Curated annotation (Swiss-Prot):
Keyword line: Chaperone, Mitochondrion
UniProt-recorded name of the protein: Succinate dehydrogenase assembly factor 2, mitochondrial
GO BP annotations listed: mitochondrial electron transport, succinate to ubiquinone; mitochondrial respiratory chain complex II assembly; protein-FAD linkage; tricarboxylic acid cycle
Assigned GO CC terms: mitochondrial matrix; mitochondrion
Annotated family: Belongs to the SDHAF2 family.
Positions of region (Disordered): 42-71
Record-linked Gene3D superfamilies: Flavinator of succinate dehydrogenase
Top-rank taxon, per record: Eukaryota
Functional summary from the UniProt entry: Plays an essential role in the assembly of succinate dehydrogenase (SDH), an enzyme complex (also referred to as respiratory complex II) that is a component of both the tricarboxylic acid (TCA) cycle and the mitochondrial electron transport chain, and which couples the oxidation of succinate to fumarate with the reduction of ubiquinone (coenzyme Q) to ubiquinol. Required for flavinylation (covalent attachment of FAD) of the flavoprotein subunit of the SDH catalytic dimer.
Binding partners and assembly: Interacts with the flavoprotein subunit within the SDH catalytic dimer.
Classification via HAMAP family: SDHAF2
Amino acid sequence: MSVLRALPRVARVVRPAPPSLRSISTTNTIFKSPTADPFPLPFSDPELAHANNSLPSNSEEWPLPEPLDRTGEDEKTLRARLIYQTRKRGTLETDLILSTFARDELPNMDFEEMKQFDKLLDEPDWDIFYWSVKKRDPPARWKGTPLLEKLQKHAKNEGKVVRMMPELMQKEPDL
């Protein structure tokens, strides 16, 4: 009983916090619309904050970035770029398949085959992976092409070879 008498009574009315201490989520007057950016960048265009930048719900309808125009690229530069692009894609599975394929097939490719391989590398990583392991049907532009058939055969790995990322330079460059 003495413990209850020692506790102070909390019988006063709780008042709301002053506006300066309220959280942003309770302050509806700051935002003009529910889609407005609550944290705009300092020098950003205010029109961009109100733009509708929604993507379609189906990921296959998303716009792909346009590949860079590489007209006038010589064969040596193209070959070096293809070696780099097959190694540094960002998806380990695709990197292993493409880099070992490039190690085995790129030295024997002519310029037109390398340009076609370059166009294949412009496709999304997971699409290339699923086409090469035959989990999805490739689109009409790639279906039945000799390049994709070679890639599918390489990905099948009939010899059950343990694949690792190949060395970047297999021989000293000619200077």
